[in-house]
Amino acid sequence: MTENEIRDLLFNNHKEDLHTLIIQMREPLALPQDTFPSIAQLLQNRTETKINAMVENLETLRLDGKEVRLVRDSDTTTRIDLLGSIADSGDLVIIELKKSGQTERQAFTELLGYANHFCTLFPPLSESSLQSILIAPMEGRGVRDALAQELIINEKNALALIPKIVGEKIELEAYYPSELYYRWVENNVLDDSSMTVVTASFPIIEGWIDAGE
């Protein structure tokens, strides 16, 4: 099944029920009850909760267009694979589809660019009202790193779904960043180079500080 066939299948057959194709969602990481959670655990819980919330929002998604052209001043015509809206909130959903793992990193970069472009076209629109979805194998380290960066650090509404072709049908597996990414962020936050310690000394001021304590 080619990219165009997948796009047409989603638009023609799942215009209002794309969420039913999503599989293998997971429960967010449970935080420890007897100890204070680590930074990595807090980030993983928050991110996985956000991913699940974005998937749940798709229950009222309606796909409104395919190969939607973006008007630009250059000769190159840019098209969005699928464009939709969420009935409950009115948020826009931009979907980019790449079947090949070789081009998925570029596709994700373009997807983020489309979101910025919409905000430029409609100044009252903010990125919090946009949801960007990449349907791709998520095989490359580059695209996995980029998605983790946007989700964990930049707090973007970005979601990745891995297509699973079964005959003439398709399933979309929800992608969750590996716990290694959260550990990496934690290690960088707590790294010595990320911290600055300042000490200050001053003479005792009568009546201000009790020097006897």
Model-predicted regions and their roles:
Residues 1-213:
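Charged, terminal alpha-helix-loop-beta segments
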